[in-house]
Amino acid sequence: ITCAADENDGGNYQLNGESFETTSDQDLYFGTKLAINDADQTDIIIGLAVTDTTLLGGLADGIYFESVDGAATISTVTEASSSETQNDSAGTFVDDTEIELEFYYDGTAGNVEFYIDGSLVNTHTTTIPATQMRVSIHFLTGEAVANTCTIDWIRCIQIGR
């Protein structure tokens, strides 16, 4: 994804169809490998969310990773009915360096485990959305420069028992 060279230019992308949900009889996995060229001058949300045309403007339901302009820190977020649990400083983006971001919803335990580069960084037990969601990405530049987010892969798997 390459932004135009104006502050807050970028894109809001969502996979067609709300195909993934958190239910007690299923497990859910989301993962991606990406790199950002200027980590502290961009905004990103990546994960699962309900249909929304401005994810960074405040979405109602989702499970995602977030980083905002002015910092390269990564937050883990679960959000249900516009109420969120957010853990800041779960990790840090480094310019032009690939990073793996993954989360796993355990339907039996009812929690979401967040991983960065294979290491568990947070577990959320509250504000887990109970609605169907879609793979979602919102990426913006935070300066008058055409910044990029290079996504190597994204995968999302829901497994019933």
Role assignments for model-derived ranges:
Residues 1-73:
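Secretory/extracellular carbohydrate-interaction modules
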Residues 23-25, 94-96, 128-130, 144:
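Surface-exposed coil/turn segments at beta-strand junctions on protein surfaces, enriched
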Residues 30-32, 96-107, 112-114:
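Short tryptophan-centered beta-strand motifs in secreted/extracellular beta-sheet-rich domains
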Residues 42-44, 63, 110-112, 147-149:
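Short beta-strand/loop motifs in extracellular/secreted proteins, especially
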Residues 45-49, 63-67, 75-79, 102-104, ...:
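Beta-strand-rich, repetitive solenoid scaffolds
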Residues 77-100:
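Short, aromatic/His-centered strand-loop micro-motif at the edge of beta-sheets
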Residues 90, 116-134:
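Short, solvent-exposed beta-strand-to-loop segments that form ligand-recognition rims
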Residues 126-161:
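Ligand-recognition surfaces built from glycine- and aromatic
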